[in-house]
Amino acid sequence: QKIADQILCVKGDHVCYYGTPEQIFEEQTIRELYGIENGFYDPRFGSIELPKVDGEPEVFVIAGCGRGIPIYRKLQKDNIPFATGILYTNDVDYQLARLLATEVITEKPFCQITQEHLQKAMQVMEKCKKVICTDVPIGECNKGLEELVLAAKKRM
C-alpha cells in the first residue's frame, strides 16, 4: 500500500479490482474483496474490526489520544456493549469508537467541551454499570473532562 503505484486484486480465478492504493483500500472495496459481512475494514488503521456489540452500554470509557483503543477492542472481544466520550472527531480513539461503541459522545475538533455534550456524557455514564477512566491528558480544550472524571470517581 505504501510503495505500490497500482494494485491488482484477484478473487478466485479472475481480476476483480485494479487501481491505485487510494482506490483499492476503501472500506467497501475491501468488504467486497474479502466477503466481510459483519464487521468493518478501517482504512485509517488498515485493520478489520469485528462488529459492535448490540445492546445498552454497560461500560462507559473516558478516553482520548489513543488511550481507549485497547480497551474498546477488549470490551468488544468480551461481547460487552460500551459507550465512550467525550471524543473529538479528529481523535484516533474516535476512529475506532465510531465502529465499536454503541454510543459515542463527540465534540468538534479544537473546541472546548460544551455543557450540552458534558451533560449528555454524564447521563450516559450514569446508566452504565461500570466506568473506565484512561489516563487521557487534559488541557485547555478538553478541560470539561475533569468534571466527567470527578463524577466517575464519586461512583467508586
What are these regions (language model features)?
Residues 119-124:
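Short amphipathic alpha-helix with an adjacent loop that forms part of the alpha/beta core around
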Residues 1, 125-126:
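A short, aliphatic-rich alpha-helical micro-motif
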